[in-house]
Amino acid sequence: MMKMVCSSSSSSLLVVAALLAVFVGSAQGIAKVPPGPNITAEYGDKWLDAKSTWYGKPTGAGPKDNGGACGYKDVDKAPFNGMTGCGNTPIFKDGRGCGSCFELKCSKPESCSGEPITVHITDDNEEPIAPYHFDLSGHAFGSMAKKGEEENVRGAGELELQFRRVKCKYPDGTKPTFHVEKGSNPNYLALLVKYVDGDGDVVAVDIKEKGKDKWIELKESWGAIWRIDTPDKLTGPFTVRYTTEGGTKAEFEDVIPEGWKADTHDASK
């Protein structure tokens, strides 16, 4: 699957120094920190340890284009509102972790509030600095601070924190959405799946044409995008069914209309 690397260019010099130390240490025979076990769709009270950095503008949503390796767009706007982050390998899971939600909290430095925030995974990072690493948007990173002390927290550059996976709860009125991606045509359909309540992430997507009984399985393309290549014309309308990591299935009847066009239908029902 196609992957993009999350940039941390706006983190403090402390983070840059830490990364240089990792690379220098590796050259001297010191192993990089290996990733932890994959985080799955299990929920509870247990908190795990992680490190966090930030990237992009200090109060921004991370990527310059407000997108990321999951394929989402406008993550600076509702319902994400910039509360986003890049997960390392056991969190991003080669795109299977896109859309999953996590509570994060920090207790040091003193500017940390100690209160949990909730972030959505929208991007990927490969920095080998901890078994679990969240590279957050500047806005999300600062949100872990006491009111008025956001710059003090961002100034730390890198934080030790605790995290746990939680179920995603989107604002009332937010519905799962299927965006027909650019490049789609009658023989190729690519769907971006987003705003999934509960587990947040999707592990399977199928479509069924109106009047037919057979479900057609889509393949993973990259991030949260699923695709099908077929010699048969895809005319629609199509019912879409997704399966989340925890096994929840949901169907959306005729959500892709007849005569659909690429990059024109951001459809939800």
Swiss-Prot record:
Compartments (UniProt record): Secreted
Keyword terms, alphabetized: Allergen, Glycoprotein, Secreted, Signal
Signal peptide range in chain numbering: 1-29
Short name of one Pfam family: Expansin_C
Gene3D superfamilies listed in its UniProt record: Expansin, cellulose-binding-like domain, RlpA-like domain
Domain Expansin-like EG45: 67-173
One BP annotation, GO: plant-type cell wall loosening
Residue ranges of every copy of the Expansin-like CBD domain listed in the record: 187-268
CDD domains assigned to the protein according to its UniProt record, in alphabetical order: DPBB_EXPB_N
Family per record: Belongs to the expansin family. Expansin B subfamily.
Protein name, per record: Major pollen allergen Pha a 1
Organism: Phalaris aquatica (Canary grass)
